[in-house]
């Protein structure tokens, strides 16, 4: 596996193919242990992990904290409502305080983009060894979700061999509110790194044309691997047209809490055009996998019949895969420069 090169995990834009494979190799090991009934391993015994969530979260926070506990780490949680923030303390001071308490890793989620990055810079300037793991920041990035989505797709297409290269030239359809989705941005970095051809499907107000060049400034180390080049990003305005040749579909939540007014004529109109229903899915004859990062707005972006009845709906797989994926990230950060 080699040395892990990142002190912080803030985005997937600087991940090399080898970084992805290191994460997935560990994810496979941890998943096997979990499936064998192992509740805890002592990999991070003596480490202190602090989750600092300035934005509401159930799935991500619980998944990270369970991942840390399965690695035998000590876990503490920060609650903004009962913290010194209400007394005027800054976000940076809060992070520095937890670092001074001996936190080895800060798991940070915030509604504004780049807050984890700014905290990591301040920590580095004070020469602390504390790492930052971005659990979602504004519209910018959600690296752990991007990784677990990629892992889930690879497991579907290559369940025994676990070959990420199997995604090369696959057509992955991402449907919905890309504009407000940090998950979509992380998915774009991850999928195109392995040569997948991504089709973004939605109205112009939620998928501007500039998304076609989202990953054009690829870091050089992305291409030093057996895959010759990145995949592509194209845009479709018709779900019926784009689903016909898709190899997989990732449905995104319509993020009404982040949305400016007047981006959609109506929720009803959006659902008529972009809600994934059995009728629309029947236009594809390949029994393709369906993913959704959750939480789900049933009947708005995806039909209940697909969630509850379609055999290749992998939403629960995503949730269960999140724990070993996040175990892998915590473990790798704990080994940085050690």
From Swiss-Prot:
Q: Which GO terms describe its cellular component?
A: cytosol
Alphabetic keyword roster: Pyrimidine biosynthesis, Transferase
Report the record's Gene Ontology biological process terms.
'de novo' pyrimidine nucleobase biosynthetic process; 'de novo' UMP biosynthetic process; amino acid metabolic process
Q: Superkingdom of the source?
A: Bacteria
Protein residues bound to L-aspartate: 87, 182, 253
This entry's Gene Ontology molecular function terms read: amino acid binding; aspartate carbamoyltransferase activity
Q: Where does carbamoyl phosphate bind?
A: 59-60, 109, 142, 145, 294-295
In which pathway does this enzyme or protein participate? Pyrimidine metabolism; UMP biosynthesis via de novo pathway; (S)-dihydroorotate from bicarbonate: step 2/3
What reaction(s) does this enzyme catalyze?
carbamoyl phosphate + L-aspartate = N-carbamoyl-L-aspartate + phosphate + H(+)
Q: What is its EC number?
A: 2.1.3.2
Assembly and oligomerization: Heterododecamer (2C3:3R2) of six catalytic PyrB chains organized as two trimers (C3), and six regulatory PyrI chains organized as three dimers (R2).
* Alphabetical list of NCBIfam families matching this protein: asp_carb_tr (TIGR00670), PRK00856.1 (NF002032)
The cross-references to HAMAP family, in alphabetical order and at most eight, read: Asp_carb_tr (MF_00001)
The family note in this entry says: Belongs to the aspartate/ornithine carbamoyltransferase superfamily. ATCase family.
Protein purpose? Catalyzes the condensation of carbamoyl phosphate and aspartate to form carbamoyl aspartate and inorganic phosphate, the committed step in the de novo pyrimidine nucleotide biosynthesis pathway.
The protein in question is named Aspartate carbamoyltransferase catalytic subunit
Species annotation: Prochlorococcus marinus (strain MIT 9515)
Identify the gene encoding this protein: pyrB
């Amino acid at each position: 596996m080699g040395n892990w090169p990142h002190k912080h995990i803030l985005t997937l834009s600087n991940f090399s193919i080898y970084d992805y494979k290191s994460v997935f190799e560990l994810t496979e090991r941890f998943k096997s242990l979990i499936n064998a009934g192992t509740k805890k391993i002592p990999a991070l015994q003596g480490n202190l992990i602090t989750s600092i969530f300035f934005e509401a979260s159930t799935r991500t926070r619980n998944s990270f904290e369970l991942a840390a506990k399965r690695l035998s780490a000590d876990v503490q949680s920060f609650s903004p409502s009962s913290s010194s923030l209400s007394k005027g303390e800054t976000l940076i001071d809060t992070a520095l305080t937890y670092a001074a308490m001996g936190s080895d890793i800060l798991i940070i989620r915030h509604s504004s983009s780049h807050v984890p990055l700014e905290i990591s810079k301040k920590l580095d300037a004070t020469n602390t060894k504390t790492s930052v793991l971005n659990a979602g920041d504004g519209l910018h990035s959600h690296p752990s979700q991007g990784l677990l989505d990629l892992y889930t797709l690879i497991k579907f297409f290559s369940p025994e061999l676990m070959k990420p290269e199997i995604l090369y030239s696959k057509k992955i359809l991402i449907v919905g509110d890309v504009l407000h989705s940090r998950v979509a941005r992380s998915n774009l970095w991850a999928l195109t790194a392995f040569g997948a051809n991504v089709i973004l499907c939605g109205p112009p107000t939620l998928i501007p044309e500039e998304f076609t060049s989202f990953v054009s400034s690829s870091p050089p180390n992305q291409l030093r691997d057996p895959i010759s080049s990145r995949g592509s990003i194209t845009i479709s305005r018709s779900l019926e047209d784009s689903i016909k040749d898709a190899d997989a579909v990732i449905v995104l939540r319509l993020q009404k809490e982040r949305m400016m007014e007047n981006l959609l004529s109506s929720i009803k109109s959006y659902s008529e055009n972009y809600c994934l229903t059995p009728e629309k899915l029947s236009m594809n004859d390949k029994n393709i996998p369906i993913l959704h990062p959750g939480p789900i707005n049933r009947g708005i972006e995806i039909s209940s019949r697909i969630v509850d009845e379609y055999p290749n709906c992998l939403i629960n797989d995503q949730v269960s895969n999140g724990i070993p994926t996040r175990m892998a990230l915590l473990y790798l950060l704990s080994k940085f420069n050690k």
